[in-house]
Each structure stands twice: as structure tokens, then as C-alpha cells.
Amino acid sequence: MGVIIGHASLSENKTVNGSKGDQTGREVCTRNWYKYGGKSWSCVIRFRDPEMADKVARCVEMACRNDLIGYSQDTRNTLLKEARKYNYNVSKVTVPCNTDCSALVSVACMYAGIPESTLTLNGNCATTRTLQPILKSTGEVDIYTTPQYTANSDRLKRGDILLAVGHHVVTVLKTDGNPYRLMNNLLKEGSMGESVKFIQYELNRHGANLEVDGVFGKKTKLAVMLFQKENGLLVDGIVGTKTLTKLGAYK
């Protein structure tokens, strides 16, 4: 499948301004990775904490699925206004609103734990010109500018932010890799650690919306049971060899 990115793209008018909400289903959307301008991105911004990176990606995924969120630069901060009510969980937004590429990434970073006060100035979200220095100042990210990262998708990870300074910004949602290691082939409710993060990450790649916290709690068990049911497995909420195989753990 390759690398999939998510972004706020363009209004229903194929211009920078439009009505509130996604009128076409493609204003805030996913697509295959591409080189900006056919050449390269300016940089790749990567959170050092994989959990923060995953939350950035999940927020963008939720925005892509919520058709009440559209694209328009003149009302770019209305998503923030609505998402703020739900601790930046954009899946809970129920009022038509808009964002643009950098405002969406700003809200996603807030969902990951970066303070709103860091990412806004006088109520205005960071832009494609200010996003890089702002995130760098937090100490939470690494910045990559070599062609191996900016003009190639092989080294990208989920949650990476691809920035073309002054132009556009997108978020990596899906790659062919998992940032966590599987060190235990039998996991169940009560299990903890990196192996649990591995399966939570894989379940999210299959449509779940879990916190990647390394704790196999009730929500993770329910997600496992739903996955097992959808894939014709014994529905017991226990992750063993058969469930791991269906999850793609042994690719």
C-alpha cells in the first residue's frame, strides 16, 4: 500500500476559502505520499515520543473521517474553537467548522500534548512558516532536512509531519513499519509493556482508536475482540499467535 498521508487540502470551490464543513469528502482527506512540488519537502518533523507521534496521526485520521470539518483559510481557527471543548478530540466535533493544513496539524499537536498557548498567537494557529520553529522550541521533536527524509518515503514513520515551508504541511498516517517491538506472543487483559503498545498500534492500523499506552485494559480487550470477530477468529480477547498473524505481526 505504501505511505499514506492525511491533510487539509482545498475547499469545495478548489480555492482557499469555502463553506464550513467538508462539502466534497475530500477537503480534509487521506492520499498517497508524494514529493511536494514534484521535488521535495522542506523538512520532516518527528516527535521523539512515539506515543505523541501516534496521537498526532490519530487526530488527523479522525479529522479526515469527520465531514463536519472542512477547509477554508478565512475560518481556519473554527476547528480549534470546537475541538477545544473536547480536549482537542476532533472526532467529537458536531458543529460544521473549518481548518487549513497548518491549523489542522496545530490542533493535532495539541491533542498530542503540546499546549495550545505554544501553538497559537492571539487565537491564530501556527502557519506553515511558524510551525517548524514553534515545534522545535518545545524540545519534543527532531527535524530532518536531508533528501533521505524529504524526498523519499522509506524512512518515514507514523506521525511524522512533512512541511513545505510557506506552502503546505501533511501528516504521515500509515507506513509499512511499527515503531514498537513485539517481545511476547501471548497478551491479555492486565498485560503491560512495549508488546502491548505493538498490538495497540497494529489495532489502530486496522481501524481501532486506542491510546497507545502499553496497558492492556478493557478498551484494548474490546478492540481485540472486535478484530477477532471481523477476522473469523475465536473471540476471547486474548492475543496469541493466530491473532498476531491476522494483525500482520509476522510479515
Where are these regions (language model features)?
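Short, structured beta-strand/loop micro-motifs enriched in basic residues and often containing a Trp
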Residues: K136-Q148
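N-terminal capping segments
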Residues: M1-T120, V165-H168, D176-L182
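Conserved hydrophobic/aromatic packing and binding residues within compact polymer-binding modules
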Residues: V224-F227
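Short, well-ordered loop/turn sites that connect or cap secondary structure elements
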Residues: T150, R155-L156
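Hydrophobic (often cysteine-bearing) scaffold residues that line and stabilize catalytic clefts
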Residues: C97-C101, M192-S195, I199, T220
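Loop/turn positions that initiate beta-strands
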Residues: R158-D160
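Acidic, Ser/Thr/Pro/Gly-enriched interdomain connector segments
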Residues: N178-G214
